[in-house]
């Protein structure tokens, strides 16, 4: 609480356990009727219900996601920065730059191991990257491409954004605004056509989306996949099963 700007805090208790929580909590656990909690890995899994049916969906383990979360937790403990308070201590001590450089070194090492795994699998032609808007997908794809190139492959970063349909045809959300994040905003048919053509050894003129005009353009961006070539494809729907067929 050293860095808090207010002198009062709310403490919550249940039986003999008391703790601080960063948000508001219900007056009693009796309000919480629809949920599931069970041991998972070295912790617990807490599941919330569907907002309409109030039913808790069947649990489907996301092993890669849990591995990533565990790695992040382990890094925080190793650097002794596993809480916001500890992070504030580092900043107050003027060690921000050292922390950033250390984190970058750890991340680059992880990217290198990922690249080595891709190379060792041998027959990979597609590397798919997904994440929400402004999460660093493009930056990550380029960093991964550098590591792949250092291991003898010829990576070609591709942005799914270049497969947007013309802006005039883009779906709108419930507020009437253009919805660039829905799968329907992408020309899935064209994407599948181009990828299949590349896999069959044909030369493809890849599109480039002009965000100023809101239209797709072709600028002699030709590509033919060779033996050591690999496509590094990134976008919001990079891991969406409905993207490919």
Feature names for model-found ranges:
Residues 136:
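Conserved glycine(s) of the Walker
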Residues 139-144, 159:
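Hydrophobic positions on the alpha1 helix immediately C-terminal to the Walker A/P-loop
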Residues 146-156:
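Post-Walker A helix-loop "phosphate-sensing" segment adjacent to the P-loop in P-loop NTPases
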Residues 233-245:
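ATP-dependent NMP and nucleoside kinases share a basic, alpha-helical "lid"
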Residues 127-131:
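Hydrophobic anchor at the beta1->P-loop junction of P-loop NTPases
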Residues 1-109, 114, 119-122:
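Auxiliary tRNA-acceptor-end handling modules of aminoacyl-tRNA synthetases
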């Amino acid at each position: 609480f050293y860095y808090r700007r207010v002198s009062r805090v709310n403490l919550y208790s249940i039986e003999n356990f008391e703790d601080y929580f960063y948000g508001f909590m219900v007056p009693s656990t009796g309000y919480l009727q629809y949920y599931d909690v069970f041991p998972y890995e070295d912790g617990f899994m807490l599941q919330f219900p569907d907002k309409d049916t109030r039913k808790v969906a069947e649990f489907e383990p996301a092993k890669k996601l849990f591995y990533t979360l565990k790695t992040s937790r382990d890094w925080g403990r190793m650097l002794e920065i596993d809480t916001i308070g500890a992070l504030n201590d580092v900043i107050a001590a003027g060690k921000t730059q050292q922390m950033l450089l250390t984190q970058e070194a750890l991340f680059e090492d992880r990217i290198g191991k990922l690249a080595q795994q891709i190379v060792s699998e041998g027959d990979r032609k597609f590397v798919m990257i997904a994440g929400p808007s402004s999460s660093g997908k493009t930056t990550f794809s380029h960093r991964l491409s550098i590591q792949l190139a250092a291991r003898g492959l010829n990576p070609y970063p591709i942005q799914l954004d270049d497969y947007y349909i013309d802006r005039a045809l883009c779906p709108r959300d419930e507020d009437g605004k253009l919805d660039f994040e829905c799968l329907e905003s992408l020309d899935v048919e064209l994407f599948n056509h181009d990828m299949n053509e590349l896999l069959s050894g044909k030369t493809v003129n890849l599109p480039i989306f002009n965000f100023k005009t809101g239209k797709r353009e072709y600028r002699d961006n030709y590509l033919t996949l060779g033996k050591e070539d690999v496509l590094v494809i990134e976008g919001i729907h990079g891991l969406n099963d409905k993207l490919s067929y």
